[in-house]
Amino acid sequence: MKSAEIELKFPIADLNGLQAQFPALGFQLDTPRTFEQNTLYDTPGRTLRASKQILRVRSYGGIWTVTHKRPAGTAAVAEEIVAPAPRYKIRIETETTVEDGPALGEIFEQLGYAPVFRYEKFRTEWSQVTGSIDGPLFTDLALELPAPRPRSHLVLDETPIGDFAELEGPPAWIDATLAKLGIDPATCITESYGRLFLAWKKRTSSAAENLAFDEIPTGAEVLQASFS
């Protein structure tokens, strides 16, 4: 399935306190806290990264998913949605489930791609009915989208380097949700977990190569506690 993804992240200081607000705001719990592991693939010359694309294989709740993401790439999108740019992260996402993630990874490697980065987290998924999305963004991109998209999403990610929330939905809904949760828009970010990891490595001088619980001591403690 191909779709336009509009999202924004913000760091969380008190995950339980934030999550306690969700039911009163009309959010529904879709997926309880679940371990997620992601592997990014690229060429030896990092051609995907250079063009701001990702190729990812994800394991989440016993389901394997392959995803390709690329920039939206049209001036019309930027003018319509991002004010001021780059307020939101906007990408085109093509995604589908697969039966055997490791086998798909082997296929990628035979085609010249290699695993270049692994990142892990515990994710909790919530959603809220927000109606449908329409307008110039989706017309200009000429995407084959179903007419209604009734739910927008708020996910909580517990990573080895900290907790983050991610809002995905129409820009107006994102802004309204931030206000209802009391989140300062100035604290919001659009960086990927890969870039957040690199910034963390620079600050801490860590030798870790992946955003993984087994490579980051504090993360390893979280992992052990979660499965004990």
Stretch-by-stretch model annotation:
Residues 95, 166-168:
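Active-site scaffold segments
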Residues 12, 168-169:
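Conserved residues at beta->alpha junctions
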Residues 172, 178-189:
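A hydrophobic, small-residue-rich beta->alpha segment in the mid-to-C-terminal subdomain
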Residues 15, 174-175:
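Short, well-ordered alpha-helical microsegments
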Residues 59-61, 160, 171:
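A generic beta-sheet turn/junction motif
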Residues 1-149, 187-228:
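N-terminal strand-loop-strand beta-hairpin
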Residues 154-161, 168:
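A contiguous pocket-lining binding segment that forms or flanks enzyme active sites
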Residues 165, 175-176:
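Short active-site-adjacent structural elements
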